[in-house]
Amino acid sequence: MRIQLNTIDLQCIIALSCLGQFVHAEANREDLKQIDFQFPVLERAATKTPFPDWLSAFTGLKEWPGLDPPYIPLDFIDFSQIPDYKEYDQNHCDSVPRDSCSFDCHHCTEHDDVYTCSKLSQTFDDGPSASTTKLLDRLKHNSTFFNLGVNIVQHPDIYQRMQKEGHLIGSHTWSHVYLPNVSNEKIIAQIEWSIWAMNATGNHTPKWFRPPYGGIDNRVRAITRQFGLQAVLWDHDTFDWSLLLNDSVITEQEILQNVINWNKSGTGLILEHDSTEKTVDLAIKINKLIGDDQSTVSHCVGGIDYIKEFLS
């Protein structure tokens, strides 16, 4: 596939300058700290999406970065608009001020955060992975996937299949970093490289963003908003990742019973993962319980799918 871009589109992708135009957990926190999402931990991504010439010219690099992507300054990011909250990790929520509106620590949401839906709907994090294809084979409706940039460039065929079948794809950062614990520059790097992975693989720029571990506060929001991104959280957590642990905090049957209970109300966004075969098998069982009357995040709130889609 050869991308056909006009001058304005090319400038928009390279500098992300077009983005300025668009501009509840249920388990014990100690259990949550054991998360193992099992996305590929590599020194350098096993690249399958070619590193585009326009990105090489802009960044000075020749290949996709490893798990710690370099910060590339962007002229539209206004650091004066970013509040000066202290960085914190997942083990120190007691020191996080309430006015920072931390979702992970205080279950706080802002006016533009999406955290529920009028139809009970599944959402999937951490892909694309080899297991994602099994889930796609099952889905008879459009769903929302929040993809890691490092996985997008390794599985462009799966990413493009999701796109072709009408699923909504949002950013989940480049390499699954807990954003409140890193500098402003590192947050920007995680976002910009995830967007560039989507640009290069799917010819589009995301509107929707889900922070890894639900780690978002008003410092993180002040940065992601400048990219035109809107945060998507959740009000139903399956804790499916815990099934990968030797000492799981919840059983599969308990998860399925929770879904049955949630389905009685018929509303909400469910957090799941398509990163492993085990979580995908569970997702298929959940899908059978809920059925096909589900919505993408954009349809839940009557929003757009993407900020920009480039012709190919």
Curated annotation (Swiss-Prot):
Keywords in alphabetical order, please: Carbohydrate metabolism, Cell wall biogenesis/degradation, Chitin degradation, Chitin-binding, Cobalt, Disulfide bond, Glycoprotein, Hydrolase, Metal-binding, Polysaccharide degradation, Signal, Sporulation
Q: Where is the active site?
A: 125 (proton acceptor), 273 (proton donor)
Q: Which cofactor does it need?
A: Co(2+)
- Modification comment: N-glycosylated.
The compartments listed are: Prospore
Q: Which residues form the signal peptide?
A: 1-44
State where Co(2+) binds.
126, 172, 176
Q: Which family does it belong to?
A: Belongs to the polysaccharide deacetylase family.
What this protein is called in its record is Chitin deacetylase 2
- Gene assigned in the entry: CDA2
